[in-house]
Amino acid sequence: MLNPSRYRILAIGKTRKAWIQNGLNLYIKRLPGLTITELKDSDLKKEAQSIRSSIKTNELLIILTEEGESLTSLGFANRLKSLGSSRLLFVIGSANGLDSEIKAMANWSISLSPLTFPHEIARLLLIEQLYRAKNICEGGSYHRN
């Protein structure tokens, strides 16, 4: 079973759109223990420094990037399940992406889609997929094949 209290989402910039924040709040309630931390957006080097200082020593760094691995929802759920009791830090960069240093540090890079989305929407897509993965692993009815 997936344990959302082992997951953190680190996002550069603020969620400004109320409808996105409402969606995030909905899934946060469904995933007790999951936290989303917003860091100030800046130039890539400063953002990288903020990200580095936010990584805990026992966390696996998972970045969302267009060059990342494409997965189905089932594949994502199975991958999370295979990581067992690891603590996971999901990082969503700013509109300028992520610094190459952060990309090199990543334990896993994933792509939500070959399409480009605003970074606020990427947060909502990620948290929905985390909820879906948890539901898949628990045999729930939220995900339909």
Curated annotation (Swiss-Prot):
Keywords: Cytoplasm, Methyltransferase, rRNA processing, S-adenosyl-L-methionine, Transferase. It comes from the Bacteria. InterPro entries: Alpha/beta_knot_MTases, RlmH-like, tRNA_m1G_MTases_N. GO terms for molecular function: rRNA (pseudouridine-N3-)-methyltransferase activity. Homodimer. Pfam families: SPOUT_MTase. It is an enzyme of class 2 (transferase). This is Ribosomal RNA large subunit methyltransferase H. It is found in: Cytoplasm. It comes from Prochlorococcus marinus (strain MIT 9211).
